[in-house]
């Protein structure tokens, strides 16, 4: 199949509601780009069809419980051992990994404006700017948050991350992620997740692109438990899309970059590694449209905890304490009676990195801009600014629909340490704390 053509659903078992994708979360998928490329009833035939090589990609130990066991079988033109060659260290640029102690910054609530799009040519790897790190990449715990600024597609360059899975959150411009498993296209208000070890390249679709990137060192993202919410709402499994098989058979010099142990390595290949003709399994990249998230909330009074907006969670070994929660604040109705409707003032055991894809965030109508970010680390107080407080305290409590907005949060159990880049960036707002300065003493013991 020509990788430059739109991927199609071809062959045995490739069922999906959208051309090019298969619907579902964590399914055991199967797809082939050439008829008969996928063996039936076995994984490793003596001679695979079309002269392909059978290769397993494992995302969990062999003995992981069945519900947590992740692997896929790939039928490819060349095995990955043919891809490795000799690796040499490459320049990491502004990409950092935990633990990153390069800058000792005083604790504070922090907020950044959106970075400007650079004029120079920057591919994905050159355009990553790490904002915070948490945990330890070598113990497979924690995360890193990054911004990406891309002005040039990767050409004859590919990458995979052995340290963690990557979640792309576009804010400006669309991306085409050409992966071993197939092609994923995403735009602002969509996300994509690329598991550890999956080779891919990043291409621009409609000009320069800016967005956020979460690097998850810990357990793979999964859907949160709904508890008493029941069987529906929040992020529904059917809205997650995994690409059908698409491959290229190109014998051209290609650079392969690997992030491993917090460092970047590279080698040169004589061919493209995007050569998987068929695959089956439950370890694969996927995309999700955040606009399909079905929010739930208070329909009587009070403001519920933000955990009800969790799209995906990376669990830790402690039940209910996430390695990462990915939370969004989408369009929704505000109807609670006799209630302060914005998020309340808070001190939290978790550390919160927030971004804004579009619109206005209801707790911060000023200063928190699309493409910007904020960091509220563990046990540092935060909450609505003066303007939001006054409006919510005195406004008419009629039903109001928040429209045209999409904020998100990467929340982790670990403290998030700020990188030197983030601490010295010209986009760092030195007056962020002033947004609370106008909150005056209102206490009057004579007026209950």
From Swiss-Prot:
Its EC number is 1.13.11.5. Fe cation binds at residues 346, 352, 382. The keyword Metal-binding applies. Keywords: Dioxygenase, Iron, Metal-binding, Oxidoreductase, Phenylalanine catabolism, Tyrosine catabolism. One of its GO terms (cellular component) is cytoplasm. Its cofactor is Fe cation. GO terms for biological process: L-phenylalanine catabolic process; tyrosine catabolic process. The keyword 4Fe-4S does not apply. GO terms for molecular function: homogentisate 1,2-dioxygenase activity; iron ion binding. InterPro entries: HgmA_C (IPR046451), HgmA_N (IPR046452), Homogentis_dOase (IPR005708), Homogentis_dOase_bac (IPR022950), RmlC-like_jellyroll (IPR014710), RmlC_Cupin_sf (IPR011051). Gene3D superfamilies: Jelly Rolls. Pathway: Amino-acid degradation; L-phenylalanine degradation; acetoacetate and fumarate from L-phenylalanine: step 4/6. It is an enzyme of class 1 (oxidoreductase). The active site is at 303 (proton acceptor). It catalyses: homogentisate + O2 = 4-maleylacetoacetate + H(+). Homogentisate binds at residues 361, 382. Hexamer; dimer of trimers. Involved in the catabolism of homogentisate (2,5-dihydroxyphenylacetate or 2,5-OH-PhAc), a central intermediate in the degradation of phenylalanine and tyrosine. Catalyzes the oxidative ring cleavage of the aromatic ring of homogentisate to yield maleylacetoacetate. Belongs to the homogentisate dioxygenase family. NCBIfam families: hmgA. This is Homogentisate 1,2-dioxygenase. It comes from Rhodopseudomonas palustris (strain HaA2).
């Amino acid at each position: 199949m020509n990788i430059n053509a739109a991927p199609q659903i071809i062959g045995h078992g490739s069922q999906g509601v959208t051309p090019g994708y298969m619907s579902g979360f964590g399914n055991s998928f199967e797809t082939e780009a050439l008829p008969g490329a996928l063996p039936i009833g076995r994984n490793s035939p003596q001679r695979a069809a079309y002269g392909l090589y059978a290769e397993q990609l494992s995302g969990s130990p062999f003995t992981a419980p069945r519900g947590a066991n992740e692997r896929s079988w790939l039928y490819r033109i060349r095995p990955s051992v043919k891809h490795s060659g000799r690796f040499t260290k490459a320049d990491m640029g502004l990409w950092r990994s935990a633990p990153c102690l390069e800058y000792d910054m005083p604790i504070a609530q922090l907020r950044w404006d959106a970075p400007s799009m650079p004029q120079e040519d920057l591919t994905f790897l050159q355009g990553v700017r790490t904002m915070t790190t948490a945990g330890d990449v070598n113990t497979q715990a924690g995360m890193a948050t990054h911004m990406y600024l891309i002005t040039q597609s990767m050409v004859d360059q590919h990458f995979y991350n052995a340290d963690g899975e990557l979640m792309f959150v576009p804010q400006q411009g669309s991306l085409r992620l050409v992966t071993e498993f197939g092609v994923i296209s995403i735009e602002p208000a969509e996300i994509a997740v690329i598991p550890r070890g999956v080779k891919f390249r990043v291409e621009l679709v409609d000009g320069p692109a800016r967005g956020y990137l979460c690097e998850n060192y810990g357990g793979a993202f999964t859907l949160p438990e709904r508890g008493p919410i029941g069987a529906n709402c929040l992020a529904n499994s059917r809205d997650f899309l995994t690409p059908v098989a698409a491959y290229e058979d190109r014998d051209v010099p290609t650079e392969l970059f690997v992030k491993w142990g917090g460092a970047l390595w590279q080698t040169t290949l004589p061919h493209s590694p995007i050569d998987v003709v068929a695959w089956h399994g439950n370890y694969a990249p996927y995309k999700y449209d955040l606009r399909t998230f079905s929010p739930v909330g208070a329909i009587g009074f009070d403001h519920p905890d933000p955990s009800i907006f969790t799209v995906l969670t990376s669990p830790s070994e402690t039940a209910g304490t996430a390695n990462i929660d990915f939370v969004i604040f989408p369009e929704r109705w505000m109807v609670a009676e006799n209630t302060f409707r914005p998020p309340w003032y808070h001190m939290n055991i978790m550390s919160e990195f927030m971004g804004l894809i579009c619109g206005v965030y209801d707790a911060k109508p000023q200063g928190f801009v699309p493409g910007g970010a904020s960091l509220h680390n563990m046990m540092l107080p935060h909450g609505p600014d003066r303007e939001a407080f006054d409006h919510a305290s005195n406004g008419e409590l009629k039903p109001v629909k928040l429209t045209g907005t999409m904020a998100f949060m990467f929340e982790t159990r670990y403290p998030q340490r700020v990188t030197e880049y983030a601490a010295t960036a010209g986009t760092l707002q030195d007056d962020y704390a002033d947004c609370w300065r106008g909150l005056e003493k209102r206490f009057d013991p004579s007026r209950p």
